[in-house]
Every structure is written in structure tokens, then in C-alpha cells.
Regions:
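Intracellular loop-helix junctions on the cytosolic face of multi-pass helical membrane proteins
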Residues: 1-18, 168-248, 269-272, 302-307, ...
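Extracytoplasmic gate region of multi-pass secondary transporters
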Residues: 39, 242-275
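Intracellular juxtamembrane helix-capping segments at the cytosolic ends
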Residues: 41, 126-141, 266, 353-370
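Central cavity-lining transmembrane alpha-helices of secondary-active solute carriers
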Residues: 59-80, 290-298
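Hydrophobic core of transmembrane alpha-helices in multi-pass small-molecule transporters
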Residues: 112-128, 337-355
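Glycine-rich segments within core transmembrane alpha-helices of 12-TM secondary carriers
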Residues: 142-169, 175, 197-201, 380-394
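Transmembrane alpha-helices of Major Facilitator/SLC transporters
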Residues: 280-307, 322
Length: 456
């Protein structure tokens, strides 16, 4: 037996609390570090770049990366669904190295080619999430593990952008003097420099993740086996759940677009609301960390619900509340009841309460409650691929059809739209999957065998 195999066996036998802490930490660190290769470019404004287009240069960069990320999600439907355990770590490392190479290219090519470079940067990164989820899904504690993983991209987005802002200013990120660069880093080199700072931690985190053992027989009995899905199995899944999946995809398209807009232009929005240069150096980290703690507390509670149908209904209730909060928070801000910083924070809480379950928790419970054997990653990537396509459409709409609107004004309008559409589609999908779950007979015994797939 290899050293990795022996360590995996040891991990299988440790106390559940230790195992869950190890698994959650390794996954969190892996995806947290990935964001250092994706989001730092958004910390800069690129206001002095004239590239001869009605679309702002920063908007073009955002769209280019989203297009690459969306294309990656389409590729991930096949790649992540079919990736065997032995290939995952190598794939993760290769994807990140390709993304960093694209950031170096972004720094050295002319402005128009920089747009292409960010497309190439997004192209590998969209598959990282699915590969990490493959290590965590199908376990009795999947809700807890996936809740921690989901908080990684909430926290990391603010942290890596604050690191990028510190590099631009030539100061030490978070006061850690050993991280300071000799001088301010140029705007176009800052993304690559930030990624380089997180490369070694990423490699270490992937190594820890690779040591996780496969789900136990008890995990399989409770959550169904999660084998790779080939083309025929993927088509069978879509045929069986098409009405519900269609409603969820429509909701997710708008939530993804809203989340992306808030995330990519938070620096711009806060400067509009508080005055340029008055935003605290660690403001983004503080906002997103508070949001992440609240979301984690809510999502982790799902671990205590063993009945899959009840858990699924609870997840839809949480998402419904998140969509409602988008509209309520915007109404409070417009009426002067809360300030801009609190509004941005509540928008983050609302969108992530509705958005985070899509990234694993929701589909993991759908698979379990309907007794469909297969990896939830396929369903996640179907939603993701459509979601990022919607994000591109909304970015273009803002610059081409609402150029006079400020970033904060457009965010407020967008929040109202996302709230109304989200409430409608989530209600429809929730009722659909509740009926599907009610029609499934949960096995009365736990023996590790795979029960009926209920094929149509």
C-alpha cells in the first residue's frame, strides 16, 4: 500500500470531528487560494485605458473572464462529471498553472490582447469547483463540508482584492510586513503577483485534499453512490427532472449575474457611496467575512436534518428568504433606513443565502431525496454554465443600454429584479422537487447497497 493509501486509511478511522475538520479545512484552503488567480484584477479600476469602444475597459475585462469561466463550466459538465479519483489532483494543479500563465500574459500584451488573456485566465478556473466538490460529496456530513467550502469564495473574494489593493499601494496586506513588495505593483502586473503569492499554499492544500478517503459504505447507503455520469446517464437525469431543473437554472442565471456584478464592482460602488479614497483598506474583507460567517451558520444547521425531503424543503426556504432580503434591503436603503455599507452587506447576505446552496448543498440533497445515483457535480455545472452566460448578458446590458446609470443605481435596480424573479422561480422549483421526493420510498435498511435508480 502506498503512503497516501495508508494516510487515507488513518483518516477514515479518526474521530468524525477530526475528519470533518481536516476535510473542510483542506477544501476551504484549496478554493480560497484559487480565487487569488481569479478576482484580484477587479481591485483595480483601469480608468485611464482608452481602447476605442463604447464598453468600458474594465467591463470588457470582466466579461472576457466570465466568458472563459462560462466556457469552462460547459467543459466541466463532461470533465468534472467523468474525472476519476486518480486524475483530480493533477487536473487541479494544471488548471491553476494555466490560469497564472494567462495572468502573466495579461501583464505584457497590449490592451486589446489583455481582454483575450483574461478569457484564457477564466477558461481553466471554472472547473476547479467541481473537482473539489467531488472529494466532499456523498458523505453523511456533506452539508457541513460543503457549507464550509461555499464560504471560501465569499471570504476569499474580499481578501484577495484587498491584497491586490495593497500591492497597488505598495503597502503590506493586512499589516503582514513579510508580504510587502519592494514598491507599488503596476495595475496590470498586480493580478499575477497576487496569484504567485498564493501558489504554494494552493499546492499544499491540494496535497491535503488528495489524502481524503472515499465515502464509506455508510455514506453510500445514506447518500447514494456518486459514480461518474456518462452521456446517457446525464441525459436520463435531465429528462427525469427537466421542469424543476429549468426553474432552478432560470433563477441561478439571475443570481449569478447579480452576485458577479456586486462582486466585480464593489470597489466602485463603495467609492460612489462613501467617496473615492475613503473606503477602508480592509473594507471588502470585513464585509465578506461577516457575510460568510452568517451564511455558514445557517448552512451548517442543515447537517442536523437527516430526513432528505425535510432538508430539501428547508434549503428552498433559506433560498427564498435570501431572495426576499435583496428586495427588502434595497427598499430600506432607498428610504434612508440603512447606509450604503450596510446595504452592500445585506445584499451580500441575501444573494449568498440564495446562491450558495446551488453550488452543492441543493443538488446533493436532490440526489439523495430522489435516490438518483450519480455525482451532483453534473447538475451543479448545468446550472453554472447557464448562470455565467446570464452574467455576461447583464454586463453588456449595463454598458450598452444603461450607460448613464451609476454602478450603485444599477445595483439597486438589479437587486429588485433578482428578488422578484428569484422568489417566483424558487417557489415553482421547490414545489416540483417536493413532489418528486414524496414519490420516492426511502430504503428501510442500511447495508451499503445501491437501491433503485427509479429510471423512467
Amino acid at each position: 500500500m502506498t503512503i497516501i493509501g495508508r494516510i487515507s486509511d488513518r483518516l477514515r478511522d479518526v474521530h468524525p470531528a477530526l475528519f470533518n475538520g481536516y476535510a473542510a479545512s483542506a477544501a476551504f484552503a484549496t478554493y480560497f487560494c484559487m480565487y487569488a488567480f481569479r478576482k484580484p484584477f477587479a481591485a483595480a479600476k483601469y480608468g485611464d485605458v482608452d481602447w476605442g469602444s463604447d464598453v468600458e475597459f474594465k467591463t470588457a475585462l470582466v466579461i472576457a473572464q466570465i466568458l472563459g469561466y462560462a466556457a469552462s463550466k460547459y467543459l466541466g459538465i463532461k470533465v468534472c462529471s467523468e474525472a476519476s479519483r486518480g486524475r483530480r489532483a493533477a487536473l487541479l494543479v494544471g488548471l491553476i498553472l494555466a490560469a497564472e500563465a494567462a495572468l502573466v500574459l495579461f501583464a505584457v500584451v497590449p490592451p486589446r490582447a489583455k481582454v483575450v488573456a483574461l478569457f484564457l485566465n477564466g477558461l481553466p478556473l471554472g472547473m476547479v469547483w467541481g473537482l473539489v466538490v467531488r472529494y466532499l460529496e456523498g458523505r453523511q456530513t456533506s452539508e457541513l463540508l460543503l457549507a464550509v467550502l461555499s464560504c471560501s469564495f465569499i471570504v476569499s473574494s474580499g481578501v484577495v482584492k484587498d491584497v491586490g489593493r495593497a500591492l497597488l499601494a505598495g503597502t503590506a496586506p493586512f499589516g503582514i510586513e513579510m508580504l510587502v513588495w519592494p514598491s507599488p505593483v503596476p495595475e496590470f502586473w498586480m493580478p499575477a503577483a497576487t496569484g504567485l503569492m498564493f501558489l504554494a499554499p494552493f499546492l499544499a492544500a491540494v496535497g491535503l485534499l488528495e489524502l481524503l478517503p472515499e465515502p464509506s459504505p455508510l455514506d453510500v447507503a445514506e447518500r447514494m453512490q456518486r459514480p461518474p455520469l456518462d452521456g446517457s446517464a446525464r441525459r436520463r437525469f435531465l429528462r427525469r427532472f427537466f421542469p424543476g431543473i429549468a426553474s432552478l437554472v432560470a433563477c441561478y442565471m439571475l443570481l449569478t449575474a447579480f452576485r458577479d456584478y456586486r462582486d466585480n464592482y464593489m470597489v466602485d460602488v463603495l467609492d460612489e457611496l462613501q467617496g473615492a479614497g475613503r473606503t477602508h483598506p480592509q473594507a471588502l474583507s470585513a464585509i465578506e467575512t461577516s457575510v460568510a460567517i452568517a451564511v455558514l451558520a445557517v448552512m451548517a444547521c442543515l447537517f442536523a436534518i437527516k430526513n432528505h425531503r425535510r432538508a430539501l424543503a428547508t434549503i428552498f426556504g433559506i433560498m427564498f428568504a435570501g431572495a426576499a432580503l435583496l428586495g427588502c434591503a434595497t427598499a430600506l436603503w432607498r428610504n434612508g433606513a440603512i447606509d450604503g455599507s450596510m446595504w452592500v452587506t445585506l445584499l451580500g447576505l441575501g444573494v449568498y443565502l440564495a446562491y450558495v446552496p446551488f453550488n452543492a448543498l441543493l443538488f446533493d440533497r436532490i440526489m439523495a431525496s430522489t435516490r438518483f445515483a450519480g455525482t451532483a457535480v453534473f447538475a451543479i455545472y448545468v446550472a453554472d454554465s447557464a448562470g455565467y452566460s446570464g452574467s455576461v448578458a447583464m454586463q453588456l446590458y449595463k454598458d450598452l443600454y444603461a450607460p448613464q446609470a451609476s454602478r450603485s443605481e444599477f445595483l439597486a435596480w438589479f437587486a429588485g429584479l433578482a428578488s422578484v424573479v428569484g422568489l417566483t422561480t424558487l417557489a415553482a422549483a421547490g414545489l416540483y422537487f417536493d413532489r418528486k421526493s414524496a414519490s420516492v420510498r426511502t430504503p428501510s435498511h442500511v447495508d451499503g447497497t445501491q437501491h433503485s435508480l427509479l429510471s423512467p
